Amino acid sequence: MRFLLQRTAFYLFTAWAAITLNFFIPRLVPGDPVQSLISRNQGRISADAIESLRVLFGLDANENVWEQYLHYWGQLLHGDLGLSFTFFPAPVSTVIGDSLPWTVGLVGITTIISFLVGTALGVGAGWRRGSWVDGLLPATTFLSSIPYFWLGLVAIAVFAGPGSFFPSSGGYEAGLVPAFDGYFIPSAIQHSILPAATILVSSMSGWILSMRNMMVTVSSEDYITVAHAKGLSERRVALSYAARNALLPNVSGFALSLGFIVGGTLLVEIVFSYPGLGYQLFQAVGAKDYPLMQGIFLIITISVLVANLLADVAYLLLDPRTRKS
């Protein structure tokens, strides 16, 4: 319990520091976002509304940065992320709420599948060295070295095109309304196949390689020799003794990968024009959309910290030495 309290206190401090940076960094970007907003909406927003917009977006010239910072925290504590410049007058929470399910559905599922399959293959490759799984490593390592966006472009060039089953862009067929029905769901799955395959191919090698190396290291430990001497089955020794201890570094890496689900596949979403949160972040940076950038960074920060806390809990469950310390 003391360990968890210490880690929780550390993560709370880290969250405060990250949110503080989240407030200041966008304000260091050159340019005036309010003027940019008026230019994009020329004819619909009066230039006389500049000061009102500055107050609305927390950029009041009559307030110093410290007052703006306190105002920002007040909004956060009330669950108010402000209004988006890019999608004005839509609230940031609405924009994020519309995009987050796409990213979690695509990247979350593919990350979990990649971890489970890669870890299982890594256990086999490390426990039975020289097997067919070992032969996969050079190919998977080569594919994982290719950048996400380049692999995505290759996938589009090879598998997408006129008359192809695989769409090259978008999250669903034009004209459909997002809903849980027999028209939208198959279309969404069809549009997610290529980006999901790109992420799987690029990320699986890391899990295989790290798990294989840990299995090789663990297999030479004394407790593995003792387990064999006790007459335990090969399967039980491999899974209950070797894999359980070799899994610890992968658990930490998996938690971090879950934390980076939101922003880690930005380029994949851009290449496939996928309506996820990474693509929204790209648009927000280009439009100097402070509130949307801050909202997305906040989601990324919280997801990373929560994922690390879950990794600490997993360590407590998997490694008795952590509980004793």
Regions found by a protein language model. Name each.
Residues Y11, G43-R44, F115, T141, ...:
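Residue-level recognition of pore/gate-forming positions within transmembrane alpha-helices
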Residues Q6, E67, H71-Q75, G79, ...:
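Short hydrophobic helices that act as membrane-entry/anchoring signals
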Residues R2, L100-V133, Y148, L176-S325:
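Alpha-helical transmembrane segments of integral membrane proteins
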Residues L5-Y11:
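N-terminal signal-anchor/signal peptide hydrophobic helix marking the start
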Residues L21-L28, H71-G74, A139-G170, T198-M204:
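Membrane-water interface segments at the C-terminal ends of transmembrane alpha-helices
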Residues W16-L21, V65, Y69, G108-I112, ...:
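Hydrophobic alpha-helical transmembrane segments of multi-pass integral membrane proteins
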Residues A15-Q68, G163-F184:
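Hydrophobic alpha-helical transmembrane segments of membrane transport/permease proteins
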Residues D60-T119:
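An internal, D/E-rich "acidic patch" concept
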